[in-house]
Structure formats: C-alpha cells, structure tokens
C-alpha cells in the first residue's frame, strides 16, 4: 500500500503520545523557526520527516520518531519539499 499522509492521520498515528512528544521536542529544538528559510513563529508550520515516511518504515523508530530525521519547516517550504519529492527528485537535505 502506498503511503498517504491523510490515511496515516485518519489512523491516529499523529495522535500517538510518542509522536506528540518528539514533535514538541523538535519545535523547541528548532526554536519555532523554519530551518530552510528562517521564518520565525509562523502560525502554519510542519514537523517534517527528512527521510519521507512510507508504510514500510512507519514503524521504524529511526525514521518515524528520531529527532535527527525531523525538521521544522514553514508551510511554504514544506509544500515545496513535498512537491519536489512527488516529482521524483527524492528528498532534499537542505
């Protein structure tokens, strides 16, 4: 099955206590600042997986819940990264 973020959201994965804890840690670590463009305190931001989640790696802590694989992006930068990934260019390691 192909990974779909909406399906994962519907499954409750993003409500797990483990995800919520690491998400909050990354927000603090990155000081509510987009690591790509430097936007500070934007209302809309995403804790982004550098190595994209797939159904195959969703249960792999080193990918799904490892702070070293997470970064804070503003919505604009996150959308650009996601579009690039979907076009088949792979993951940008900004």
Curated annotation (Swiss-Prot):
Pfam families, sorted: HNH
E.C. code: 3.1.-.-
Function statement: Probable HNH endonuclease.
Keywords per UniProt: Endonuclease, Hydrolase, Nuclease
Gene source species: Lactococcus phage SK1
GO molecular function: endonuclease activity; nucleic acid binding; zinc ion binding
Class in the EC hierarchy, top level: hydrolase
Domain of life: Viruses
Annotated protein name in UniProt: Probable HNH endonuclease
Family, per entry: Belongs to the skunalikevirus HNH endonuclease family.
Lineage: Viruses, Duplodnaviria, Heunggongvirae, Uroviricota, Caudoviricetes
């Amino acid at each position: 099955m192909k990974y779909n973020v909406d399906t994962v959201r519907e499954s409750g994965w993003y409500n797990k206590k483990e995800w919520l804890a690491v998400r909050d840690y990354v927000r603090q670590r990155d000081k509510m600042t987009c690591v790509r463009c430097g936007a500070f305190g934007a209302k809309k931001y995403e804790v982004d997986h550098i190595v994209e989640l797939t159904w195959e790696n969703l249960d792999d802590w080193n990918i799904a819940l490892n702070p070293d694989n997470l970064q804070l992006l503003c919505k604009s930068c996150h959308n650009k990264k996601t579009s690039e990934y979907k076009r088949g260019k792979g993951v940008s390691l900004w």
